[in-house]
Amino acid sequence: MPKMKTNSAASKRVRVTGSGKLMHAGSAMRHNLEHKSARKRRELKADGVLATSQSKNMKKLLGR
């Protein structure tokens, strides 16, 4: 039986933690940062945990 391919688009967008949770980078940090406060930029820098309903589908794409 051949190896299952992971979806490369999905693997670039999330990372799996040691406990199996999926982390994703936040949006709104690419440009126009001069209009955001330092506090807002700090908050947006942190990675978010993917919702369980989405992580179920994402794990299928990652082959887990």
From Swiss-Prot:
<feature type="compositionally biased region" description="Polar residues">
    <location>
        <begin position="1"/>
        <end position="10"/>
    </location>
</feature>
<dbReference type="GO" id="GO:0006412">
    <property type="term" value="P:translation"/>
</dbReference>
<keyword id="KW-0689">Ribosomal protein</keyword>
<feature type="region of interest" description="Disordered">
    <location>
        <begin position="1"/>
        <end position="64"/>
    </location>
</feature>
<dbReference type="GO" id="GO:0003735">
    <property type="term" value="F:structural constituent of ribosome"/>
</dbReference>
<dbReference type="InterPro" id="IPR001706">
    <property type="entry name" value="Ribosomal_bL35"/>
</dbReference>
<keyword id="KW-0687">Ribonucleoprotein</keyword>
<dbReference type="InterPro" id="IPR037229">
    <property type="entry name" value="Ribosomal_bL35_sf"/>
</dbReference>
<comment type="similarity">
    <text>Belongs to the bacterial ribosomal protein bL35 family.</text>
</comment>
<dbReference type="InterPro" id="IPR021137">
    <property type="entry name" value="Ribosomal_bL35-like"/>
</dbReference>
<dbReference type="InterPro" id="IPR018265">
    <property type="entry name" value="Ribosomal_bL35_CS"/>
</dbReference>
<dbReference type="GO" id="GO:0022625">
    <property type="term" value="C:cytosolic large ribosomal subunit"/>
</dbReference>
<protein>
    <recommendedName>
        <fullName>Large ribosomal subunit protein bL35</fullName>
    </recommendedName>
</protein>
<dbReference type="Pfam" id="PF01632">
    <property type="entry name" value="Ribosomal_L35p"/>
</dbReference>
